[in-house]
Amino acid sequence: MGIRKAYTKDMKFARALPAPSPRSETAKKVAWIYAAVLVIMVVGQLFSFEKFIPLIAGYWLPGGNGATTLLAGLIVVSEVFALPFLLRMPLSPLMRWFSLGCGLVAAVLWVILGVIAVVSDNAMTNSGILGTKVTVPSDGAQLLWAVVLGVLAVWSAWGLWPADRKK
């Protein structure tokens, strides 16, 4: 009987719970905007993923083709897994934190790639932010887009923070 009680107690943590209320309506709207931007980005990237990997390889990152493929996959997966947190779906507490982290990781990766594109002398015609079908030049425009993503990610994380807030 003791094992069953321990199992039941431990499995309550894995139960999907409704999202906590946002700090403000503005934060909720910012999260929806960030989610919409991520959906547009990930659809563009997944539409021709086999051509997205060479775009990421154009940043001349260390590690060769394996690291480039891993980074391209990490970018797309983090953008997809950020959506449940941003859309305030019922999630387990651990998944809510993971989804929050994915939203921040996606923005940070694009900021890092934007900085690399600006400081390197590599002449890329497409940054890959919107995949291969929509060309976003890899210069200051990409860095600006990435910084806007970062601001949206931090604002969403602050406004929808899943930890208990003291009122």
Range-by-range predicted roles:
Residues M1-F47, G73, V77, P84-K167:
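Extended, low-polarity transmembrane helix blocks
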Residues M41-I75:
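Solvent-exposed, well-ordered loop and adjacent helix/strand elements within mature globular domains
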